[in-house]
Design a protein with these regions (language model features):
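Acidic-glycine-rich active-site phosphate/pyrophosphate-binding loop
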Residues: 75, 171-184, 516-521
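Hydrophobic helix-and-loop "lid/oligomerization" segment in the mid-to-C-terminal part
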Residues: 2, 9-140, 160-161, 211-435, ...
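Mid-to-C-terminal polyanion-binding domains and interfaces
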Residues: 75-81, 312-316, 322-357, 409-575
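Generic beta-sheet signal
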Residues: 114, 144, 167-169, 183-185, ...
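Intrinsically disordered, low-complexity regulatory tails of plant transcription factors
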Residues: 150-151, 235
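A short acidic, amphipathic alpha-helical/loop segment
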Residues: 152-156, 369
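Short gly/pro/ser/thr-enriched loop/turn and capping motifs at secondary-structure boundaries
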Residues: 119-121, 150, 170-175, 189-191, ...
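Short alpha-helices
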Residues: 99, 175-216, 221-233
């Protein structure tokens, strides 16, 4: 009940356009309004949106340096040089390494992969990693999901006779590393028409270009799309444009013929009998892959993702699942400790940010804790721990606010930083934490907008229960895969009542199972409100209330639709 609801009724012009598109497509005007908001204004565009085609992927050679990268890779193979595939320890990095390694290994055997240890080497290209490459005779490193800021490390590698091809999607600094080729659609002189690829997505485009250059049929790349889909979903990049095509077909691959490693993870997650969605990747598959790098070493995730024997893969997946259980325990403990620290801040009510530092916290979980604090207190949060004599941590942000720019403003206090709009990593000398806290707070206070300081639920449409027909739900499902820039629509219905059977459920009695009647149409719908058991007293008063919700398939009763309640508020009308 504390959330602000934001709904902008459609203008007369928008309503007319939605009706016209509905007439052309046969789709509900409510859903046509959502299509128009996504830039889709004709039946032909709707068809391309609902059925993305792999033939619509951009030419990979439109990316700057792609021709150079392919030539250098071909040269390395021709000379029989040792190649090292190097990547970050998160989901995007490990899937990227697995993808490039698996594909190239079909044509070339003198190849290895490397994932830096989060605790010994930190994020990105490390001197230790370069030394490993040199000692093992590597002449070419393909670095994925990192490297765009590794100016010193790549210069060091160059001195040792090692070339780099960078495949990254992070924002670069003014000075680019001295790599042979830099594949990054965010570089200032970028020529590629889509800038939101994941790190694994950039790796896929590199392999696509390599395949084209060497006469390899595209169908040999399609089995790798499952890894791209996992990376896109887990890295929370926009799922429109080229990412929508890649994710749509990646999910088809996951649900028809996933790689052995992914099949093992799906089995361990208990998802073998259901259709895998972006949500399953974000909340179940991705966290398990991530747990390897958080708790142990990301290399174990790559070992699983490239494994060919299912029984061996299942053993590895179970081990990674254990890491995830450890991660959850650490998450719970550290979040509780962090909450206590935050609640003791004297000026908490006046602050726009949270910055906390605990030398004993586990480095692999601080990003999750930062996310929890952002959710609880709804403000940008930075959580720091001590690693190798530095205060190292993660930042998370609220909707609409660019935390990367806020951190960049304090760059003179930092040893290293990088990331995106809503998530970033950083490190600094411990003596700089106090000044960083002050400057970070100052920047955010001066730049955050009033509407970004409280949780807002953006409502896409107001509907009645009678609008939720089987055809409506089937058309809504065609908007999948959902994600940033194509979020799952949130609907609102006014003046609903408890039908009499709503009750609190859950192991800790934290959820509400609802049966609701719409006062306007008298239609009845089932729903579930997760974590909202405190609302049940109001619901049982027999007074009307408004709900906002997404429409889901009931996982316990296949074919039955239910409402997943996001929030509940008393109706404004008198009862």
């Amino acid at each position: 009940m504390n959330n602000k609801w934001n709904y902008q009724p459609p203008s007369q012009e928008q309503t007319e356009k939605a009706k016209a598109l509905a007439k052309e497509t046969g789709i509900s005007p409510v859903l046509c309004k959502l299509l128009l908001e996504r830039g889709i204004s004709s039946a032909a565009e709707a068809k391309r949106f609902f059925r993305p085609q792999l033939m619509e992927l951009h030419d990979p050679f439109l990316m700057k340096d792609m021709d150079i990268a392919v030539d250098r890779l071909n040269e390395a193979m021709g000379r029989k040089e040792r190649i090292l595939v190097y990547g970050d320890y998160d989901v995007d990095g490990t899937t990227a390494v697995a993808l490039v390694y698996k594909f190239l290994q079909q044509f070339y055997s003198n190849i290895d992969y490397y994932i830096p240890n989060r605790y010994e080497e930190g994020y990105g290209v490390s001197v230790k990693g370069v030394d490993y490459a040199y000692e093992t005779g590597v002449k070419l490193i393909i670095v994925l999901d990192c490297g765009i800021k590794a100016v010193k490390e790549i210069a060091y590698a160059k001195e040792k006779g090692i070339d780099f091809i960078i495949c990254d999607h992070h924002v670069p600094d003014d000075v680019l590393p001295p790599a042979v080729a830099i594949l990054n659609a965010k570089r200032p002189d970028a020529t590629y028409p889509y800038e939101h690829l994941s790190g694994c997505g950039v790796g896929f485009k590199f392999m696509q270009a390599f395949a084209i250059n060497n006469g390899i049929e595209f169908h040999q790349l399609t089995p790798l799309l499952d890894l791209v889909a996992v990376s896109v979903a887990s890295d929370i990049v926009p799922i429109m444009g080229e990412n929508r095509i890649l994710t749509y077909h990646g999910l088809k691959q996951i649900n028809s013929n996933p790689s052995v490693g992914l099949r093992a993870i799906i089995d361990v997650c208990g998802l073998s009998d259901k259709e895998i969605t972006v949500g399953d990747i974000v909340f179940k598959i991705g966290p398990r892959i991530n747990a390897s790098g958080r708790i142990q070493n990301g290399k174990e995730a790559v070992e699983l993702l490239v494994e060919k024997d299912f029984s061996t893969a299942l053993e590895k997946a179970n081990q990674i699942n254990q890491y995830n259980e450890t991660r959850k325990d650490l998450d719970k403990t550290m979040t509780e400790e962090a909450n206590k620290i935050v609640e003791q801040l004297e000026d908490l009510s006046e602050r726009r940010t949270i910055v906390i530092f605990n030398e004993e916290w586990h480095k692999g979980v601080i990003g999750i804790v930062a996310s929890r604090l952002t959710e609880i207190y709804y403000r940008p949060a930075v959580v720091l721990t001590r690693t190798n004599d530095l205060a190292t941590g993660s930042a998370r942000s609220v909707s609409g606010f660019d935390v990367y720019k806020a951190i960049e403003h304090c760059r003179d206090l930092l040893e290293n930083f990088g990331g995106h709009t809503y998530a970033a990593g950083l490190s600094m000398k411990a003596e700089n934490v106090e000044e960083f806290t002050r400057r970070f707070e100052e920047y955010v206070t001066n730049h955050i907008l009033p509407e970004q300081t409280s949780a807002v639920i953006d409502i896409d449409a107001e509907i009645d229960f009678r609008d939720i027909t089987p055809r409506f739900y089937q058309d809504l499902k065609r908007f999948n895969p959902f994600g940033p820039d194509n979020h799952k629509p949130i609907f609102c219905t006014h003046n609903v009542y408890d039908y009499g059977t709503s009750k609190v459920v859950g192991r800790e009695q934290e959820h509400i199972k609802l049966e609701l009647v719409d006062n306007k149409s008298n239609n009845v719908m089932n729903g579930i409100a997760f974590g909202q058991s405190s609302q049940v007293r109001y619901i049982k008063t027999k007074r009307s209330f408004d709900i906002c919700y997404t429409i889901e398939e009931n996982t316990h009763k296949r074919g039955e639709v239910q409402l997943q309640i996001e929030d509940i508020k008393p109706s404004e009308e008198l009862n």
